[in-house]
UniProtKB/Swiss-Prot annotation:
S-adenosyl-L-methionine binds at residues 84, 89, 141-142, 154. Its main location: cytoplasm. The keyword Transferase applies. The keyword Transferase applies. Specifically methylates the N7 position of guanine in position 527 of 16S rRNA. Belongs to the methyltransferase superfamily. RNA methyltransferase RsmG family. This is Ribosomal RNA small subunit methyltransferase G. Keywords: Cytoplasm, Methyltransferase, rRNA processing, S-adenosyl-L-methionine, Transferase. It is found in: Cytoplasm. GO terms for molecular function: rRNA (guanine-N7-)-methyltransferase activity. The gene is rsmG. Its EC number is 2.1.1.170.
């Protein structure tokens, strides 16, 4: 879907937006920020592959709602770290939603410069409380010294790798929320070979075969 998409495509996206906001309601102010974010994403998508092209007609239900649902699993969390933010899901979406919470902050970690540039522009355009870190994940989490309530990742890596990335932050008191797909059981089995974890599984509100893996404690197996 290009910025000059047809009326039919625009109508399809509008219908998808309505379905998403019924699923994960937001304030009028947050909706306006998300509108600006989606417009920017569609503009950049023409030159930078930020999301799978096949998902463009369903940006709101497939990506926005999928991201927003994390807030219900950590309602008191104000300081978030999103690993491998890419096109901004869930990091930018969370920042848009948390803009009305005084003092809230979302840190977006991205190692690819072009995507980090997009994320910075998205934070600027939406006026959301976010900071973009152009860095390898391992480099930044090991040195993290600030407060973190929740660490997230979506479409980034197998679960056992995500657990390893998140370990330093979880040991500082963060809760990990990872968006995973239909292979979650196999990924959990693989993860227990390397880590002692007590994950809680939440089915995705967006349907399909999506899951959210919540982890509060991580210990490396010897």
């Amino acid at each position: 879907m290009k910025p000059t998409s047809s009326a039919a495509a625009r109508n399809e996206l509008a219908s998808d937006k309505a379905a998403a906001l019924a699923l994960t309601p937001v304030s009028r102010e947050t909706e306006r920020r998300l509108d600006r974010y989606i417009a920017l994403l569609l503009e950049w998508q023409a030159k930078t592959n930020l999301v799978a092209p096949s998902t463009l007609p369903h940006l709101w239900t497939r990506h926005i709602s999928d991201s927003l649902q994390l807030l219900d699993l950590a309602p008191e969390a104000s300081f978030w770290v999103d690993l491998g933010s890419g096109g901004g899901f869930p990091g930018v979406v969370l920042a848009c939603a948390l803009a009305e919470r005084p003092g809230a902050k979302v840190h977006l970690v991205e190692r690819i410069a072009k995507k980090a540039a997009f994320l910075r522009e998205a934070i600027r355009v939406t006026g959301s409380p976010g900071t973009v870190h152009l860095s390898e994940i391992g480099d930044i989490v090991e040195k993290w010294s600030g407060r973190v309530d929740c660490v997230t990742a979506r479409a980034l890596a197998p679960l056992h790798q995500l657990v390893g990335f998140a370990e330093p932050l979880v040991k500082k008191g963060a809760k990990a929320l990872f968006l995973k797909g239909q292979d979650v059981d196999a990924e959990l089995t693989e993860s227990t070979k390397y880590w002692k974890i007590e994950p809680k599984l939440h089915s995705s509100r967006t349907g399909g075969q999506g899951w959210i893996v919540a982890i509060d404690c991580i210990e490396r197996r010897s």
